[in-house]
């Protein structure tokens, strides 16, 4: 392979480090901050040189899609770009926004079926005792049924979306918050649209 400049080597090493730490590559902004480049276009230029020299491969249709090639010592994981769908409440229900706001890279090993998984941003504190906080992103596997006690994204009779623990009882459904100061939502009809299988929280 063609020799790299010091800046290109620094960028490649940073990408490898982040893939090793998180299982997916860093953003252009993160790369720029790490190597002292304020301009995203300059970072893109260095990434293009790395690609031309055969060190990485990029998919222009997907954000953060950087694959490390050739003689590298970092075992990369396959990454899936999971859609982030609107906002859903973890307090009082709000209308679900069924549109893709963004995509988030997750290791394929924890996501079975990219077309059946999405993420939602939590608004509210009704699930805090389950470790789900305001502003968190929950990873949701699309499914139309759930076992009692599972945390689900559900649509109420008024087509409002909410994240709660699901219980099917004798003549009704109970959507139970994980906050001891809040009351459950009791409904005759409810539609499960997915099961929460993970939570992502940005600690920065």
Curated annotation (Swiss-Prot):
Q: Does the keyword Repressor apply?
A: yes
Q: What Pfam families does the annotation carry? A: LexA_DNA_bind, Peptidase_S24
- Keywords on this record? Autocatalytic cleavage, DNA damage, DNA repair, DNA replication, DNA-binding, Hydrolase, Repressor, SOS response, Transcription, Transcription regulation
Kindly list the biological process annotations in GO that this record carries: DNA repair; DNA replication; negative regulation of DNA-templated transcription; proteolysis; SOS response
Cited InterPro entries: ArsR-like_HTH, LexA, LexA-like, LexA/Signal_pep-like_sf, LexA_DNA-bd_dom, LexA_repressor, Peptidase_S24_LexA, Peptidase_S24_S26A/B/C
Task: Enumerate the active-site residues.
Answer: 126, 164
Entries under Gene3D superfamilies matching the protein: Umud Fragment, subunit A (2.10.109.10), Winged helix-like DNA-binding domain superfamily/Winged helix DNA-binding domain (1.10.10.10)
Looking up CDD domains in the UniProt record yields:
HTH_ARSR, S24_LexA-like
Q: Which reaction does it catalyse?
A: Hydrolysis of Ala-|-Gly bond in repressor LexA
Q: Does the keyword DNA-binding apply?
A: yes
Q: Which residues bind DNA?
A: 28-48
Gene Ontology molecular functions: DNA binding; serine-type endopeptidase activity
Q: Which HAMAP family match?
A: LexA (MF_00015)
- Primary role: Represses a number of genes involved in the response to DNA damage (SOS response), including recA and lexA. In the presence of single-stranded DNA, RecA interacts with LexA causing an autocatalytic cleavage which disrupts the DNA-binding part of LexA, leading to derepression of the SOS regulon and eventually DNA repair.
Q: Which family does it belong to?
A: Belongs to the peptidase S24 family.
PANTHER family, A to Z: LEXA REPRESSOR (PTHR33516), LEXA REPRESSOR-RELATED (PTHR33516:SF2)
Summarize the subunit comment.
Homodimer.
Query: What is the designated name of this protein?
Result: LexA repressor
Species per Swiss-Prot/TrEMBL record: Bacillus mycoides (strain KBAB4)
Gene name as annotated: lexA
